[in-house]
Amino acid sequence: MKVISDIDEVLTTTRAVRRRLNFERPVEREIVEECLRLAQQATMGSNIEDWRFVAVTEVAQKEKIAAVYRDVWDQTVEIPLRERRPDTVTRLDPGVRGDEASQARQKRVLSSVKYLVDNIERTPVIMFACSTKPVPKAALGDRASGYYGSIMPIAWSFMLALRSRGLGSVLATAIVYHAEKLSEILKLPADTHPITMIPIAYTDTLDFKPAPRRPLNEILRWEQWTD
């Protein structure tokens, strides 16, 4: 049942939810399917539904996923930050942020991600968005834009639909660092590749606010970039 009907509220308050997920309340399969059915109206490349989804609810499966997720955290965050690897420090370390407010915000983000890593198996439903498109050879150019542009719109639409019904979620893309292990756990066909994990749970409150963002004049130019 929809609990938020105002589209502007849904668009401005759909957050990456980790700490405020209610792990104790079951999530009905019907609601998950309803939200995904709505999200299927998202745009896609060449009007071909190359997306596939796997919803995980069984404890044994979630425990396997949790082990992979924790290893990804160790390999991509915990160890690189401890060893002060420059690329990771520049991207994630709160200390390199320009002001105290940004530093505090980054500390909260890292803390909330770690909370989800430590509790992922408690999430009622863990959804995986996958693609059957050929994997692009380059991160930019080639078919990369079409590859990700054909899966992220449905993933975001799915999150919006969840939010409108009182559920929280987050795009946990880092887990595909171990895409092969995930594919084995989920028994994906050879032509199907995991793109992102989306943990799903009811939220402990509906009271989410718009996040602070840069002024539009810092990110928008008309006709060409003039700075």
Q: What are these regions, as identified by a protein language model?
A:
Residues 35-40, 125-185:
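Small-aliphatic-rich amphipathic alpha-helix that forms the alpha element of a beta-alpha
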Residues 1-26, 30-38, 47:
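N-terminal targeting/leader regions
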Residues 50-51, 123-126, 194-195:
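Short, surface-exposed beta-edge/turn micro-motifs
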Residues 114-118, 159, 184-188, 210:
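A generic local secondary-structure boundary/capping motif
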